[in-house]
Each structure stands twice: as structure tokens, then as C-alpha cells.
Amino acid sequence: MAPRALWSCYLCCLLTIATEAASYPPRGYSLYTGGTGALSPGGPQAQNSPRPASRHRNWCAYVVTRTVSCVLEDGVETIVKPDYQPCGWGQPHCSRSIMYRSFLRPRYRVAYKTVTDMEWRCCQGYGGDDCGEGPASVLGPAPSTPLPRPRPVRPNLSGSSAGSHLSGLGGEGPVESEKVQQLERQVKSLTKELQGLRGVLQGMNGRLAEDVQRAVDTVFNGRQQPADAAARPGVHETLSEIQQQLQLLDNRVSTHDQELGHLNNHHNGGPGGGGRASGPVPVPSGPSEELLRQLERQLQESCSVCLTGLDGFRQQQQEDRERLRTLEKLMSSMEERQQQLVGPAMARRPPQECCPPELGRRVSELERRLDVVTGSLTVLSGRRGSELGGAAGQGGHPPGYTSLASRLSRLEDRFNSTLGPSEEQEKNWPGGPGRLGHWLPAAPGRLEKLEGLLANVSRELGGRMDLLEEQVAGAVRTCGQICSGAPGEQDSRVNEILSALERRVLDSEGRLQLVGSGLHEAEAAGEAQQAVLEGLQGLLSRLRERMDAQEETAAEILLRLNLTAAQLSQLEGLLQARGDEGCGACGGVQEELGRLRDGVERCSCPLLPPRGPGAGPGVGGPSRGPLDGFSVFGGSSGSALQALQGELSEVILTFSSLNDSLHELQTTVEGQGADLADLGATKDSIISEINRLQQEATEHVTESEERFRGLEEGQAQAGQCPSLEGRLGRLEGVCERLDTVAGGLQGLREGLSRHVAGLWAAVRESNSTSLTQAALLEKLLGGQAGLGRRLGALNNSLLLLEDRLQQLSLKDFTGPSGKAGPPGPPGLQGPSGPAGPPGPPGKDGQQGAIGPPGPQGEQGAEGAPAAPVPRVAFSAALSLPRSEPGTVPFDRVLLNDGGYYDPETGVFTAPLAGRYLLSAVLTGHRHEKVEAVLSRSNLGVARIDSGGYEPEGLENKPVAESQPSPGALGVFSLILPLQVGDTVCIDLVMGQLAHSEEPLTIFSGALLYEDTELEQV
């Protein structure tokens, strides 16, 4: 689509120059012919020169209107900011006061306005993808010998005319057919590679399944399973996923093949192919070229899908390697278990210094008792040998002698194995010998119980041994009576069998040691391989990250491809619709073209740009320089051409950057090929190493099977006396009971370990508590030391003040006395005055004594009882979310004296007439406005708005958008006169109230005092 847009802009420039040239004098030159001769006045019918072959006259400029948005100033608004006042001089720790200052800032709003713009569209009568469909078919036949002229070349994405770097599709039909053939060859090669990868993958999956099944059978069953055995479930799932991915790749390749076939059909016998072949100059087909480019992009996408499938295959291969590593670990663990079963673990005593004396004494006592049991077994063996010898002297050794010896040896091995786990636990106990001294003194009772249990076991074992001795003696006597033969031959035969068994046992021990060394070597090699595999895993993780980034880029390219395909389908539909229309307007367009041709013939102004160094500018102003990769003509509309040149340059830069991005993506994909080769080599080395390890493990298992088979044959040769099977079975049952006892001892040891762990946890807790208390004590001691220093300083200050006060008290603050003045002379006695008026009456005399009390009066009537003080008060909180408008039900009642508040409705009903104190605290969500009204008998009394006061007349100064509320808290507090039956509630108008277990939104009220006058009113 981008090259087509560039061609359209180029045609617009030429059409604009041709339209403006029609108003100049008639003498001139044609801009659209290849020759330089003057045009004849006879019109197109009388002209013998070749007809213009350009398609650039079918674009016209239209003036359109558009609505754009802009931001306008909408007055000012007032904001309040806090201003912290600084402390005065010499007052560093004063309480800072806050002053609030108001500021003015501009307010803006969004407005819309209509502007005009120029837009290039197809002229009337023209249509199609590049406005090439119109009345051109009725203008006359094309000349047979056109004059040579420079052929326009389609520019590439970078702005040059050398062709496209991405696809190379820039010209004629033969070049396009070659490109199609090249793309078909690429598709065929990709199909072959896909089939080869599929075959390799199937072979590897088959070999991997066989190897895994063989390894599992060898470890668990000790034999090879048949070839038709079932594989593991995980392998089937992996194979199904790989087959699905391969099927997806196959479907995409088939889709690309279908598109190539469709494209070939379009080029060979598509619509419009024959008509274009008869023209003088074949014009490149825009839709076919776009289809070829789209096909190339889809091929690149399919390549990326192939790479993604290869990455999935590598990931699956890594998972198979991890499974093989797990199987190797399982094999090593099974071999270790076999080694433990074949040879009992050797007891290893700890050093004498690791245990306390009490534990050593008890352990020695246990060892002594076990030695007694061992001695009893030895005596039993000796007695059995003597009795067998006597029987041989009478009638020879019985035939079941070797079987009895083997059964007794296995019995002794099982008895030793019951002691092995306890010794191994003692050896591997994580507490260590050094911690035994901490918990043994705290558990003497448990050790005594353990000793008692061991004594009972020893007694029971002794009884069973005596019974076993009697049974063996009877069996020996019976066998001696039944069996007969030469004593010398039987002795030699028994000695040979015993010596052969001893040699086999020694050989088995040596071979088991060799097996153990081989297992250690295999384990070391496995660790080395594990390190190598971990490194490969890190490399694969980095590759996976890079492929994820490439997948994101591919997804973006696919989105753009889909958009381009949608636009292409729309344009094809439009082209089909325009192709079906008739040419009814061809006559008018032909007349208009005739007038335009006459005007061009009468034009005498030079429109071409100056070619020589001395040529000056034309009438239309200075000529414009050529665009990047295009040739343009100068004209009178210089500003319009300059604007078009700028827009085309921006488009070319955009496509250049897209081309660079595609080159970088191609480089990255090429680098992935080298990484794939490295991974393939690493995979081959890992597979060879795994095969070598598997071969060694198979050989080792085969040798072990042969050795065990030899041991089983020896045991089968040794056991031929069926009379002792039942008794030895009962003896084995006793050994199983001893195994149960050993399990109980192990449980006791585990319980002691848990108690020790609990004791250590308590010790650690006590240590932490002690450290905390020590820190507190140190802090207290430091505070006491500082307190002593402060008290000393205070005492010194008091002593100093006392000294100063004493000094001040000793000072005399009275001033010096003045001189006494002389006494004055006595005055003369004056004459007596006239008598005055009579004075007021004198005071009353004193009251007389109280008379005797009178008789007792009668008792008055009983007064009215005191009125009870009513108790009316309530307080409730909100614990449920509330965002709908209406009465708020404060459901959590904190206080409700009298029960006059209903928590379900949130309404308080006044029981008495009087003065009531009502208060409420409404807390909303942050930056959300809350509005509420306090209603008395469904009449609003008070209103709160957490956003603050908002004046009327907002329609004169509208606000562009609502500003967030700075606060979300409202408070009611007022005293109301209420009559009996009046209701009080809070109605939510706007916002959402906060709810919590801790009260945030509260409604309270209380009766202050009654008012009877209010009740009468």
C-alpha cells in the first residue's frame, strides 16, 4: 500500500501543474508526451503525435471540513494551601502554627471547532485503486510507434529507485514470475527440511522410549522386557505434542502452496491480462505486487514458526534429558539398596570420650547381654555340630545338613540386621554425642524402661533358644536314624560343599566391593554430566528469552499483515464494484479532456524547471528540488508542492526505519542458525555420554545377576531336608518379632529425639529471653548512672542557691533615717455652735427569752411520689457497606437505653417530649465526596457536604471535569426539640460510607431534659 500511496502523490503533483497551465497563452509544450514538438491546434483528432501515456490526470483537490478539539481557558479557581509559620528567635521547640493562604490558578475546558483542509480524491468519472479506471478506454487507439521516454520506476521502501530490498518485486510480469518460481523453490526446500526433521524426531523418540524402558526394566525387574512393552505415560504425551506441532507446520506449508497456486492462476489467466498486453507500455499491477509481498511476509512468518517448532523440540529434548538423569539417580539408589541387602552394615562404635560415664555403663551392660545371646547361639551351633558328628558316626551326615547351616546363617544375618538400623541411627544422629549429656539426666525413667524391655527380650530369646536346641537335637537324631551311608564319603562331601560355599561367599564379597567402587565412579561421572547439563540449561534459558522477544515482534508483524490484508480485500471489492459500472459519463469526460487539451495547446508559459545553469525561475516562482527518489515539476503552487514534499519525505523515512527493523530481524534469525548448530553438537555429545553410562550400568547389572544366580544355585543345592522347614519358619517368625521390637526401639529413639529438640527450643527461647532482660538491665543501669549525675548536679545547684539566699538574708535593705522636724504650735479653741435638730430613734432593745414549746400538731397528708428520671440514649456504628442513597441503617449497636433505636431501619423514635442531643460522624472513602441529610419526621433539618460549600450559578462557569474531593468526613452535632413519636434518621444522598469492625461511622443521641410545654403544644 505504501508504494501505491507514493505513486498517487506523484500523480497529484502532475495533475495540479496541468490544471494550472490551462490559464496561460496557447503556445506551449505538452507535459505528458515523450517528444518536444509543439502541440497542433486541431485537437486530438488532428494530431499525429503520440498520445500521452500518463495516468496522472485523474486526481483532484477537494476542500473538506474537520472537527478538532482544543483546550480553552475557563476563568480562575481558588485553592487553599497550608503555610507553616517558623518559630521565633531562641525558640527551637515551639509549637508551630499553621496559616492557610488562598491562591488563584487558571481553569481550562475542552472545546471543539471546525477547520478546513485539502484532500486529494479521484476526479469525477475516475475510480479504482489508483484512480486509473475511467474514460481512458474511449479516447482512441494507442499509437503503434510511441516515442521513447524515460520509464517511471517504482521506488523502494528506502526512497531510492533501485527496487525493494525486502522482496525484490518492483517491476514487470517476467520478473514477478521469476520471483514466484523462486518462492516456490523455497517452499519446496522448506517442505523437504520439515520432512527430514520429522523423520529424525520420530527416530529419536523411538530410541529414547526403548532406552528408557530398557533402563527401567533393568533396575526394577533385573531383566529385559519385550519390544512391545508399553512406554511411560509422559513419553506418549510428549510425542503427541510434537506431532501436533508438526501437523500445524504441515498445514501452514500447505496453505502457502495453495496461495502460490492461486497467484500463478491469477498471473496466467486472470481478469484483464490480455487487454494489458496489447498496450504500448505494460503497467505494473498493484494488487498482484501486494499479493507477492504478502506471500513473502507469510513465508518469513512460516520460517519463524519453524524456528519456534525447533525451539519446542529442543525444550522437549531437555526434558527427556532431565528424565534420564532422574532414572540414573533411581538406578544408583536401587544399587545402593541392593548392596545394603547383600552385605549387612558394619557396626561402628563411637569413641569413648563422646559419651558420659552413665551411658557408657548402660551400653556396656547391653553389649554384655548381647554377648550372652551370641554365646548361646555359639553353644547351640557347637552342640548341633557334635550331634551331627555323632549321627555321622552312627549312620553318616544327613542330606539336609547344608540347608540347615544356610538357614541358620540367614537367621543370624537377619538378627544382625535388626541391630544395624539402631547402630546406623546412633552413628547418623544429628544431635551428636556432645549433646547426650544435656538430655540423658532428664530421661532416666525411659532408659530404665528400655533396660527392662531388653531384659524381657533376652529372657524370651533364651527360652526360644532352649526350645530350638531341643527341636534341633530331635531332628538330628531322626535324620541320623533315617539316613545311612559311608561316613568318610559324607564327611568329604560336606567339607567340599562348605569350602565351595566359603569360596563363593568370598568371591561375592569381592565382586560387591568392585560393584561399590564402580557405582562411586558412575556417581562422580553423573555429577560431572549434571554440571554440564546445568550449563546447557542456562544457555537454553537465554535462548528461550531471545525467542520470546522474537515471537512478540512476529506477533506485531502478523497484526500489521492482517490489517494490510483487510485493506486489500476492501480495495478489491471496491475495484470489482467500479469495474461492473458502466461508462455513462465517458462523453462528458471526453469533452472536458478536449477543453483541457486546447488550453494546454494555447499555453505558452514555461512550466518545466530550468535545465541550464543560467536559466532563471519561471512564472510560478523558484523551482523545487526533487524529492528523495522522485522527480517533480515546478509550478505556481510552490507552497502546496513544498508541503507535499515534506509529507512524502516523512513517509519515506518511516518506511526506511521499517526496512532497517526488518534487516535487524533477518540478522537475528541468521544468528539463531549458528546457535542451533551449537546446540545440535552439544546434544550429540550428551547422547553419546548417556549411551556410554547406560552401557556400563547394563554390564554391571548383568554381572550382579550372574553372581546372584550363582548364590541361588548354591543355596538350592544346599537345601534338601524338608523336615526342618516348619520349625525354621517359626524361628523366622521369632526373628520378625525381634524386628518389631527393633522398630519399637527406633520409635523410642525418635521420641527421645523430639523431646531433645523441644528442650533445645526451650533453651534457645530462654537464652533469647535472658539476652533481652540483660539488655534491659544494662539500659536501666545506664539510666541510673545518668540519674546519679543529674541528682549531683541538682544538689550542687541547690547548694549554690542556698548560699546566695543566705547572703541575701544577711544584707540590710533599710535606708538611712532622716532628721526629725520641729513640733507645731497648738491651735485656739473655737466658739460653740447652735443646737442641732432632733436625732433619729434609737435601736430596739434586746429580744426576750424563748417561751416554752407548744403541744405537738397533727400529721400532714402524704406527698406525691418523686417522678422517675427517664433514661433515653443510644449509639450505633456502621459495619456493613453502604453506597446506595437512602436511610443509613447503623447496624452495630453500642448503646440503646430504652430500646427506642431500631438498628434494622436506622430510625430513632422519641419516647418523650424534650430536648435531645444528636450527633453523627460520617466517614467516606478517600477522594470521594459524601453528602447526607439529618431528617426529623421526614423533614430535612441539617445537611453536610464533605467536599465543602459550592455556590450556585455553576452553569455560567462550567468546569471541564470534576475535581477530586480533598476530604471525605462529615459531622452532625446539634440539639433538637422532639415531640413524642418524632423520628430521627440520617439519609445518604451521595458517596459511599466506610465500614469496619472498629467504629468509623457513628450515630448517637441522648435526652437532655423533658419539656412539658413542648408536649402541650
Curated annotation (Swiss-Prot):
<keyword id="KW-0325">Glycoprotein</keyword>
<feature type="coiled-coil region">
    <location>
        <begin position="789"/>
        <end position="809"/>
    </location>
</feature>
<dbReference type="GO" id="GO:0062023">
    <property type="term" value="C:collagen-containing extracellular matrix"/>
</dbReference>
<dbReference type="GO" id="GO:0010629">
    <property type="term" value="P:negative regulation of gene expression"/>
</dbReference>
<feature type="glycosylation site" description="N-linked (GlcNAc...) asparagine">
    <location>
        <position position="659"/>
    </location>
</feature>
<feature type="disulfide bond">
    <location>
        <begin position="60"/>
        <end position="123"/>
    </location>
</feature>
<dbReference type="GO" id="GO:0030512">
    <property type="term" value="P:negative regulation of transforming growth factor beta receptor signaling pathway"/>
</dbReference>
<feature type="compositionally biased region" description="Low complexity">
    <location>
        <begin position="811"/>
        <end position="820"/>
    </location>
</feature>
<dbReference type="GO" id="GO:0010811">
    <property type="term" value="P:positive regulation of cell-substrate adhesion"/>
</dbReference>
<dbReference type="GO" id="GO:0010628">
    <property type="term" value="P:positive regulation of gene expression"/>
</dbReference>
<dbReference type="GO" id="GO:0031012">
    <property type="term" value="C:extracellular matrix"/>
</dbReference>
<keyword id="KW-0964">Secreted</keyword>
<feature type="coiled-coil region">
    <location>
        <begin position="310"/>
        <end position="374"/>
    </location>
</feature>
<feature type="compositionally biased region" description="Low complexity">
    <location>
        <begin position="154"/>
        <end position="167"/>
    </location>
</feature>
<dbReference type="GO" id="GO:1901731">
    <property type="term" value="P:positive regulation of platelet aggregation"/>
</dbReference>
<feature type="region of interest" description="Disordered">
    <location>
        <begin position="383"/>
        <end position="403"/>
    </location>
</feature>
<feature type="coiled-coil region">
    <location>
        <begin position="519"/>
        <end position="573"/>
    </location>
</feature>
<feature type="compositionally biased region" description="Pro residues">
    <location>
        <begin position="822"/>
        <end position="841"/>
    </location>
</feature>
<dbReference type="GO" id="GO:0043065">
    <property type="term" value="P:positive regulation of apoptotic process"/>
</dbReference>
<protein>
    <recommendedName>
        <fullName>EMILIN-1</fullName>
    </recommendedName>
</protein>
<feature type="glycosylation site" description="N-linked (GlcNAc...) asparagine">
    <location>
        <position position="795"/>
    </location>
</feature>
<dbReference type="GO" id="GO:1904027">
    <property type="term" value="P:negative regulation of collagen fibril organization"/>
</dbReference>
<feature type="domain" description="EMI">
    <location>
        <begin position="56"/>
        <end position="133"/>
    </location>
</feature>
<feature type="coiled-coil region">
    <location>
        <begin position="237"/>
        <end position="266"/>
    </location>
</feature>
<dbReference type="GO" id="GO:0042127">
    <property type="term" value="P:regulation of cell population proliferation"/>
</dbReference>
<dbReference type="GO" id="GO:0005581">
    <property type="term" value="C:collagen trimer"/>
</dbReference>
<dbReference type="Pfam" id="PF07546">
    <property type="entry name" value="EMI"/>
</dbReference>
<dbReference type="GO" id="GO:0030194">
    <property type="term" value="P:positive regulation of blood coagulation"/>
</dbReference>
<keyword id="KW-0130">Cell adhesion</keyword>
<feature type="glycosylation site" description="N-linked (GlcNAc...) asparagine">
    <location>
        <position position="767"/>
    </location>
</feature>
<dbReference type="GO" id="GO:0050866">
    <property type="term" value="P:negative regulation of cell activation"/>
</dbReference>
<dbReference type="GO" id="GO:0070373">
    <property type="term" value="P:negative regulation of ERK1 and ERK2 cascade"/>
</dbReference>
<dbReference type="GO" id="GO:1901203">
    <property type="term" value="P:positive regulation of extracellular matrix assembly"/>
</dbReference>
<keyword id="KW-1015">Disulfide bond</keyword>
<feature type="region of interest" description="Disordered">
    <location>
        <begin position="259"/>
        <end position="289"/>
    </location>
</feature>
<feature type="disulfide bond">
    <location>
        <begin position="122"/>
        <end position="131"/>
    </location>
</feature>
<comment type="subunit">
    <text>Homotrimer associated through a moderately stable interaction of the C-terminal globular C1q domains, allowing the nucleation of the triple helix and then a further quaternary assembly to higher-order polymers via intermolecular disulfide bonds. Interacts with EMILIN2. Interacts with EFEMP2; this interaction promotes the incorporation of EFEMP2 into the extracellular matrix.</text>
</comment>
<dbReference type="InterPro" id="IPR050392">
    <property type="entry name" value="Collagen/C1q_domain"/>
</dbReference>
<dbReference type="GO" id="GO:0045766">
    <property type="term" value="P:positive regulation of angiogenesis"/>
</dbReference>
<feature type="disulfide bond">
    <location>
        <begin position="87"/>
        <end position="94"/>
    </location>
</feature>
<feature type="domain" description="C1q">
    <location>
        <begin position="867"/>
        <end position="1014"/>
    </location>
</feature>
<dbReference type="InterPro" id="IPR008983">
    <property type="entry name" value="Tumour_necrosis_fac-like_dom"/>
</dbReference>
